[in-house]
């Protein structure tokens, strides 16, 4: 990054290498946090919101995935057109507000709608955090940076279910969503004041259907890109299927209760 675009938009000293890794990992971890921390509370959510069919409790996770999937496409081109910071902060705002609002859901339908919105907001961090790394680093250095970020990121799926289970000891499932929103707010403020704009004005692209279609055609006609996409789709599909049914299988079928976060 040459340094004129983003750093003038943030206060204080420039972002260090270590802080950039930590912030990028924190942004990406919000996605895993929104899924894993609330898994122990699915049973309570279903009971409190009147879900009669226990299979329908999993819709709380499915709605989140649906929102994220729907928003991944528009956030990418939007960040190429308007820069990285504005779309990312917009998405973070949706994530925080939807998470806190979900804590006050009075019906299962309201919960699903808010989880869909939270997924929409989380899509911004998933797409844009990677783009910000690509803006600042290239080649081997980018690969090393992404490896470090994912090392930090992988801590969240390990500890989040246990944190959620501990919260259920001191409160109910609503406390989990309030905590989720609070953590998102802290990371949003951190990004607002410390994360610079990484996309230079001369590198921005028009946000048109033609440009989006051209980019899609480039990916779909490249054999290597298509194979990587299919492999990633198969892997993530299996992972999301496991996450979507894990709580019901571990708790409902095997009766593991509070042991679920440890075994998960």
Question: Where in the sequence are the language-model features?
Answer:
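Conserved MFS/SLC helix-loop-helix module at the cytosolic interface between two early adjacent transmembrane helices
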Residues: 69-109
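Extracellular/periplasmic helix-loop-helix junction of adjacent transmembrane segments
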Residues: 41-70
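Extracytoplasmic
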Residues: 19-51, 242-247
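Juxtamembrane intracellular "pre-TM" segments in multi-pass secondary transporters
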Residues: 6-13, 198-228
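Helix-loop-helix hairpin linking two adjacent transmembrane segments in secondary transporters
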Residues: 110, 139-140, 144-195
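Residue-level signature of mid-helix packing/kink "hotspots" within the transmembrane helices
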Residues: 36, 65-73, 157-158
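Cytoplasmic helix-loop-helix junction between adjacent transmembrane helices
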Residues: 114-153
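Extracytoplasmic gate region of multi-pass secondary transporters
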Residues: 224-264
């Amino acid at each position: 990054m040459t340094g004129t675009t983003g750093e003038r938009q943030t206060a204080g000293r420039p972002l260090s290498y270590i802080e950039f890794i930590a912030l990028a990992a924190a942004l990406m971890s919000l996605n895993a946090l929104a899924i894993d921390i609330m898994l122990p509370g699915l049973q309570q959510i279903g009971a409190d919101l009147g879900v009669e069919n226990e299979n329908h409790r999993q819709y709380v996770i499915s709605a989140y995935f649906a929102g994220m999937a729907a928003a991944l496409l528009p956030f990418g081109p939007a960040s190429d057109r308007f820069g990285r910071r504005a779309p990312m902060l917009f998405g973070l705002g949706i994530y925080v507000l939807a998470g806190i609002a979900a804590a006050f859901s009075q019906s299962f339908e309201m919960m699903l709608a808010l989880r869909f919105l939270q997924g929409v907001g989380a899509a911004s961090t998933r797409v844009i955090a990677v783009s910000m790394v690509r803006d600042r680093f290239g080649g081997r250095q980018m690969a090393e940076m992404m490896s470090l970020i994912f090392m930090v990121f992988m801590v969240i799926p390990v500890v989040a279910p246990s944190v959620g289970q501990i919260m259920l000891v001191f409160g109910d499932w609503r406390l989990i969503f309030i905590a989720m929103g609070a953590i998102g707010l802290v990371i949003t403020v951190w990004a607002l004041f410390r994360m610079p704009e990484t996309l230079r004005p001369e590198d921005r692209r028009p946000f048109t259907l033609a440009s989006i279609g051209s980019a899609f055609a480039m990916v779909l006609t490249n054999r290597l890109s298509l194979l990587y996409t299919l492999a990633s789709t198969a892997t993530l599909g299996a992972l999301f299927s496991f996450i979507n049914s894990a709580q019901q299988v571990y708790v409902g079928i095997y009766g593991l209760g509070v042991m679920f976060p440890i075994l998960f």
